[in-house]
């Protein structure tokens, strides 16, 4: 996710949405940001490979970490802990690019609801009926907005089904303020293996 920032700004500067090979225009910015992550981490760089998302959830929830890079969906993992809802917020990831004071949050999804057109007709209809139920029934809307605390971008969600998630509310404030959201560009990355290799290289760098 962090590697999306230099790609986003390169695409934006060049007026493109994809490319066969990035130029690396903002790799120095990316390095400086990652260095900050390493030096201000809750552990020594040599221990980073042993840390898990559960560690990050616990450290933030207990107030041991000030910043925690994640999305609105992570609220369920950190709520009802030492850090109260009113003390949680969200910040854009700044990398030192001109004009980023108008930057909003990274928004979007790399996962989507899909229906396999090659499935049996009855299975297709059952799937469509279920998806409709999820976003139109009282139980489904209550589950998404209150129990899961997800963003609710559907027309079927009125003020009675606004998310109770304080991170969703914080994200909404950036939209209301007219900040420019940062798109995710995962679909333009070569493969999952490519992302894994980038992660391995970053870990090797962090450990010296």
Residue locations for each model-derived region?
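Pocket-flanking alpha-helical
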Residues: 1, 55-58, 75-81
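Extracytoplasmic/periplasmic solute-binding protein
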Residues: 1-22, 65
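Glycine-centered hinge/linker elements that transmit conformational signals in sensory
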Residues: 18-50
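Extracytoplasmic/periplasmic substrate-recognition and gating elements
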Residues: 40-42, 81-148, 200
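Short helix-initiation/N-cap motifs at beta->coil->alpha
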Residues: 47-62
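Beta->alpha turn/N-cap motifs
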Residues: 53, 70-75, 109-111
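Alpha-to-beta junction loops
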Residues: 62-70, 86
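C-terminal capping/gating helix-and-loop segments adjacent to ligand/active sites or protein-protein/ligand interfaces
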Residues: 107, 150-156, 169-208
């Amino acid at each position: 996710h962090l590697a999306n920032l230099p790609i986003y700004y390169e695409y934006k500067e060049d007026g493109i949405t994809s490319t066969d090979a990035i130029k690396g225009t903002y790799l120095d910015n990316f390095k400086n940001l990652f260095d900050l992550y390493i030096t201000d981490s809750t552990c020594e760089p040599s221990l980073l490979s042993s840390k898990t998302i559960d560690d990050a959830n616990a450290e933030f929830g207990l107030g041991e970490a000030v910043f925690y890079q994640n999305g609105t969906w992570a609220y369920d993992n950190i709520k009802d802990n030492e850090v109260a809802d009113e003390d949680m917020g969200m910040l854009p990831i700044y990398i030192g690019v001109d004009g980023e004071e108008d930057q909003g949050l990274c928004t979007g999804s790399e996962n989507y609801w899909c229906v396999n057109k090659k499935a049996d007709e009855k299975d297709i209809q059952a799937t469509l009926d279920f998806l409709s139920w999820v976003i139109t029934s009282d139980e489904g809307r209550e589950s998404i907005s209150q129990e899961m605390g997800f963003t609710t971008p559907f027309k079927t969600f009125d003020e009675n089904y606004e998310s109770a998630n304080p991170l969703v509310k914080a994200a909404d404030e950036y939209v209301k303020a007219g900040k420019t959201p940062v798109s995710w560009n995962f679909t333009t990355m070569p493969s999952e293996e490519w992302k894994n290799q980038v992660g391995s290289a970053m870990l090797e760098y962090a450990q010296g």
